[in-house]
Regions:
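Conserved small/polar residues in nucleotide/adenosyl-binding loops
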Residues: 127-134
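Structural signature of FAD isoalloxazine-binding scaffolds in flavoprotein oxidoreductases
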Residues: 74-91, 106
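Short beta-strand-to-turn element immediately C-terminal to the catalytic PLP-Schiff-base lysine
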Residues: 16-18, 91, 113-115
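A generic local secondary-structure boundary/capping motif
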Residues: 46-48, 69-71, 95-104, 109, ...
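Short loop segments at secondary-structure junctions
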Residues: 20, 86, 115-119
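Short, acidic Gly/Pro/Ser/Thr-rich loop/turn segments
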Residues: 12-13, 64-66, 88-89, 118-121
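Short beta-strand segments
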Residues: 7, 58-62, 82, 105-107, ...
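N-terminal non-catalytic cap/leader segment that marks the start of a structured domain
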Residues: 1-78
Length: 134
């Protein structure tokens, strides 16, 4: 199942995506995926960033091939850094670079979205429905 966050008729919705249209989802996608009868075609909506994060924590130089491409070694323990929530863009949106930015690295990213406040989640808790309650 593919889920997207979309803009349709000046409103934001989460929707199930199929080959021809979006089917809107009722309520909170972190609680249950409940489709409604309301739909729109793919061409009628704009695909938005999937979430509106309160913060973004990323890891620098966390894989060897990227480090080698910059004549560096991967960090033994990845270095966390923050990105601003405004750095998230939607499908086909322009990437706007600040003036004098220097170097820009194009990278594929893996993202974890946690739907509740969470702290100190252990590996064994990741696969349970109680993970965000810890």
């Amino acid at each position: 199942m593919k889920i997207a966050r979309i803009a349709f008729e000046e409103q934001t919705h989460y929707a199930i995506v199929d080959n021809e249209h979006f089917t809107f989802i009722q309520d909170d996608i972190f609680t249950a995926i409940t489709p409604t009868k309301e739909t729109c075609s793919l061409a009628q909506a704009t695909i938005l960033p999937p979430v509106i994060p309160s913060k973004i924590i990323a890891l620098a130089v966390n894989y060897e091939s990227h480090a080698k491409g910059h004549n560096m070694e991967a960090f033994p323990i990845p270095e966390p850094f923050f990105k601003t929530p405004s750095s998230i863009i939607g499908h086909k949106d322009d990437v706007i670079l600040p003036q004098n930015v220097g170097r820009v690295d194009a990278e594929a990213e893996v993202v974890v979205v946690i739907g509740k406040q969470a702290s100190k989640i252990t590996a064994c808790l990741l696969y349970t429905s109680d993970a965000a309650d810890e």
